[in-house]
Amino acid sequence: MEGGESTESTHNTKVSDSAYSNSCSNSQSQRSGSSKSRLSGSHSSGSSGYGGKPSTQASSSDMIIKRNKDKSRKKKKNKGAGQGAGQAQTLISASTSLEGRDEEKPRPSGTGCVEQQICRELQDQQHGEDHSEPQAIEQLQQEEEEDQSGSESEADRVEGVAKSEAAQSFPIPSPLSVTIVPPSMGGCGGVGHAAGLDSGLAKFDKTWEAGPGKLESMTGVGAAAAGTGQRGERVKEDSFCCVISMHDGIVLYTTPSITDVLGYPRDMWLGRSFIDFVHLKDRATFASQITTGIPIAESRGSVPKDAKSTFCVMLRRYRGLKSGGFGVIGRPVSYEPFRLGLTFREAPEEARPDNYMVSNGTNMLLVICATPIKSSYKVPDEILSQKSPKFAIRHTATGIISHVDSAAVSALGYLPQDLIGRSIMDFYHHEDLSVMKETYETVMKKGQTAGASFCSKPYRFLIQNGCYVLLETEWTSFVNPWSRKLEFVVGHHRVFQGPKQCNVFEAAPTCKLKISEEAQSRNTRIKEDIVKRLAETVSRPSDTVKQEVSRRCQALASFMETLMDEVSRADLKLELPHENELTVSERDSVMLGEISPHHDYYDSKSSTETPPSYNQLNYNENLLRFFNSKPVTAPAELDPPKTEPPEPRGTCVSGASGPMSPVHEGSGGSGSSGNFTTASNIHMSSVTNTSIAGTGGTGTGTGTGTGTGTGTGTGTGTGTGTGTGTGTGTGTGTGTGTGTGTGNGTNSGTGTGTASSSKGGTAAIPPVTLTESLLNKHNDEMEKFMLKKHRESRGRTGEKSKKSANDTLKMLEYSGPGHGIKRGGSHSWEGEANKPKQQLTLGTDAIKGAAGSAGGAVGTGGVGSGGAGVAGGGGSGTGVAGTPEGRATTTSGTGTPGGAGGGGGAGAAAAAGASSSVGSSTPGPSSYPTCTQNINLWPPFSVGITPPVHSTHTAMAQSSFSSAGLFPTFYYIPASLTPTSPTRSPRMHKHPHKGGTDMPTTSQQAAAAAAQAMPLQYMAGVMYPHPSLFYTHPAAAAATAMMYQPMPFPGMANALQIPERPLGSQSAYNKSVYTTTPASMTKKVPGAFHSVTTPAQVQRPSSQSASVKTEPGSSAAVSDPCKKEVPDSSPIPSVMGDYNSDPPCSSSNPANNKKYTDSNGNSDDMDGSSFSSFYSSFIKTTDGSESPPDTEKDPKHRKLKSMSTSESKIMEHPEEDQTQHGDG
């Protein structure tokens, strides 16, 4: 239909006369003869292959009643030409385009109602006048032709049968399509054509749409012959269309151009299977296209206009009398190639009179547009231009053709299915096989580079008619990148020279080309060589490999740069598996580590999931600040401590030669992180080595020495030498230093030991010069060790829930003033050195002198202490601390016989050449010394430094803390005290007294003066718990070794006496108890974080009654009568100790004061209830608990009975106490 429809198809004919009249049916049957289109002999369901049952198929839809059909036929015959033309228009209703041609497609549907028929007839009468007279004349002529062409005898059969057959053939558009077409259409007309269609056509379309048996016509063609309507202007077309029912494969409709293309009469295909006209070899291809096309149509909707597939088949030509005469049987059947375009459509559902709806799936229609394929050549040996179309042929490595373009059919004469599966070697000319071998060699070489193509020499290719064409080919190939094997070769061919025989579709001659056997064997060998060559592995050229390696190296380099940019952060992260549950200790250890006093919050990226790194602890920052301060790392002379005049109430330390951090003020220069403790306070664990005293001990391998003492106290010193302590007690003292410290204690006497410092002693070994390389080395070792410990701690999840408070406490441990700041929760040091050393009073004859730890300084000075004689008679201990000049600063504490007295004092060498020592003993009440040294806190801390205030020394809690987010570490700065009279067994109270780092010893007589408070100042390293968590009385602070605000009571002239009366649980921290006892003496002991190293006491006249403010539930406050003897199993109140007490104190039970410590001074009460007594409330921030979580576990944990219950009163307003403390 591309070339124009026949003029015969432009006539309009009455629907009733053409499609449904007896003459139409008879003429159709007569023309088809004995074909399957004869209505009576149809093989389809029902009669004539279209109807017979109210089926679900498009070709067999129910028809209207024969009576209605017959009446409609008669009426329409009487109406006239105009009515017939209008009805013809109704058949050609819906128009859609298909390959640019107009073709009618039936939409068989259910039978129409009588009302629909009447409505259609009325519209026919109304609009029939609109059509021209020539249309009516042509309609009448067409009717006459059909009546004459058919045999009337067929129409004279039984009228009922004929009418029945005609009624059943209602939806058959084939007779209509042969002779009935609207005048405006060049081919099959349809709605929407611009030429010759008036408004009445649309109305007729609507009429037909409303009626049954609707047909859908195709749009797109016919413009050439539009509006002609003249029979003489008929133009032959070279394509045709047909509609096939997908239910049974029967042809429902064909365009009239089938006569011009294949020679068949107009209705000969109707009722016959389409596949009968397809060549046998192409039927499989046709069937495969049908089966693949149907799912596409169903998936795209009911009317998939674009669901088109194209393929090529050979269709049979008609053997008619005109073409071949009467010798039909003797002539061979001829086939012609056609390109078929398949489109799947669905007929719409229509309502039946019985309300039966036809489903969509059963109304599937196949519209086929067949276009003949002509040869590309017009003259023999035609030289084609460069613009001639190309076609592609693809074959595998074995030479088997796998794909052929449909464009190759007109050039080669083969259909694609004819070539697929055959060897391409069979089509090469035998003389060109050598050329083809070279071509395939090049193909293999080019295959080394993906996408490479090349053009080969022209070669000859065999075509369908037995001739050869000369092809120019551009070759490309695909190589499997994994196996490096050739997958397929694609050739884009262009015909350079045509064949000798122009018609490429002619049959090839039966005679074969005569080739000698030698040539045949040679050709066979070449073909085998080509196939073998194609089967080889494609190797990569060296340059290609180099290029790829270079590209990969560049990509790797860029990737590594990006990676290094990401990893170049300062923090060191350790990737550990995510743990769903973190223990309280692990979580809070990281939390508290993040709020280190010197931590930078703005650049901290660590979280509870990120393991803490050593760099995040600002260790390197401290080192950098240390070197930026340009410290004196060479040995320098320490100032003699005797240059400072003693204060009347205590000792005063000489000022350091330069500003010192609070880390450095506790000791003159203890630098070894191997011992983790210093002589200044043997119960404080070193956490980070940031002192300016250099490295020694375990950290740098400078060696550590241990000195054993016989006192009950333990003295530790750090340095590079060895320290020895001698005594008669059972205590041990460990110390390292360049000098030797000796502590002598005697069992007799309970007096207080006065610490004195003097030059002399053994000559100091030259200390190791502190260098940055040593510190860096130490930094690396500590970082590795810390990460290892952190990995181990992360693995413990189950047991740690019980010990969470204990682990939290470890975060706050402090090893002494000789070391720097380190986040406590990192679990870096979990050895014995990190365990708190708790001392309990000993009330038996074991009144030993203290063991002194050695004093030699590392770098700028050593720390040596005579130790602390904590319990027993106040023996005298001497600690010799070596000075950088080789001199030794000796501190000695002499204990006076009596109750539990502490022995030797502690000698400490100050940093930067400042030499002083601290000596303090616990026995006996004495005046508490005050230290008014101007301490240069470095660096300044956010919590301000409270100026020294001379008042009664008390430990008071602070309820309003200014820095809410900071939890600094403890720094213990002890002060020596000179007891003047024998005392009872000292009671260790944990008060971190903040005084000067180094205090020269004073005379014992100076301690007898009026009580003066030791000025308490905020230190940058002091751990001040958050006041919002809970309020703690100073008595509780004594038990917890925590200073909420280490300031004296400014308004109290008398020292507060701590009663031994725990009233209520600690949870009632918002209430305070004032207990006044008329005791003659009040014992004040400066406490360490864990225990007291150099305890001191404040002697008070018995006439002075001191009121002690204690917290309910705190067993630290003990009345003065109870201080005479410590009850059985009652450890000294400390952070690590339990608040347990057996019966109230009895004065004759000194031997029951047992020390629950091991040989190293490590308390076995670490896992006791005192962990949770303070920190459970600190962490959980619950103020409603009745008692600490763990205090109920041990039956010994009972509240101490007070001797002065009646004198106690509850203070309901703790704010008054806060005013006494000051806001800090």
Curated annotation (Swiss-Prot):
Stretches the record annotates as Disordered: 1-175, 632-764, 788-807, 874-927, 978-1008, 1094-1224
Subcellular localization(s) per the UniProt record: Nucleus; Cytoplasm, Perinuclear region; Cytoplasm, Cytosol
UniProt keyword terms in alphabetical order: Biological rhythms, Cytoplasm, Nucleus, Phosphoprotein, Repeat
Pfam families: PAS, PAS_11
Residue ranges, compositional bias (Basic residues): 66-79
PTM comment: Phosphorylated with a circadian rhythmicity, probably by the double-time protein (dbt). Phosphorylation could be implicated in the stability of per monomer and in the formation of heterodimer per-tim.
Region 30 X 2 AA approximate tandem repeats of G-[TN], annotated ranges: 694-754
Stimuli inducing this protein: Expression is sensitive to temperature but not to light.
Cross-referenced PANTHER family: PERIOD CIRCADIAN PROTEIN (PTHR11269:SF16)
Effects seen without this gene: Rhythmic changes in CCHa1 expression in the brain controlled by the circadian clock are lost.
Distribution of this protein across tissues and organs: Expressed in neural tissues and in several nonneural tissues of the abdomen. Malpighian tubules contain a circadian pacemaker that functions independently of the brain. Expression oscillates in all tissues studied except for the ovary. PER-A isoforms are mainly expressed in adult's head.
Biased composition (Basic and acidic residues): 121-133, 794-805, 1209-1224
The name this protein goes by in its record: Period circadian protein
Biased composition (Gly residues): 694-752, 895-907
Lineage start: Eukaryota, Metazoa, Ecdysozoa, Arthropoda, Hexapoda
Ranges occupied by Sequence repeats: 694-695, 697-698, 699-700, 701-702, 703-704, 705-706, 707-708, 709-710, 711-712, 713-714, 715-716, 717-718, 719-720, 721-722, 723-724, 725-726, 727-728, 729-730, 731-732, 733-734, 735-736, 737-738, 739-740, 741-742, 743-744, 745-746, 747-748, 749-750, 751-752, 753-754
Feature: compositional bias, Polar residues: 1-15, 675-693, 1094-1117, 1143-1154
Regions of compositional bias (Low complexity) in chain numbering: 16-47, 908-927, 1158-1177
GO biological process: behavioral response to cocaine; circadian behavior; circadian regulation of gene expression; circadian rhythm; circadian sleep/wake cycle; circadian temperature homeostasis; copulation; courtship behavior
Record's function text: Essential for biological clock functions. Determines the period length of circadian and ultradian rhythms; an increase in PER dosage leads to shortened circadian rhythms and a decrease leads to lengthened circadian rhythms. Essential for the circadian rhythmicity of locomotor activity, eclosion behavior, and for the rhythmic component of the male courtship song that originates in the thoracic nervous system. The biological cycle depends on the rhythmic formation and nuclear localization of the TIM-PER complex. Light induces the degradation of TIM, which promotes elimination of PER.
Motif range (Nuclear localization signal): 66-79
Stated consequence of mutating residue 858 to A: In strain: L18 and U79
Organism: Drosophila melanogaster
Molecular function via GO: identical protein binding; transcription cis-regulatory region binding; transcription coregulator activity; transcription corepressor activity; transcription corepressor binding
One of the record's GO cellular component terms: nucleoplasm
Top-level taxon of the source organism: Eukaryota
Annotated segments matching region Regulates the rhythm of species-specific courtship song: 749-868
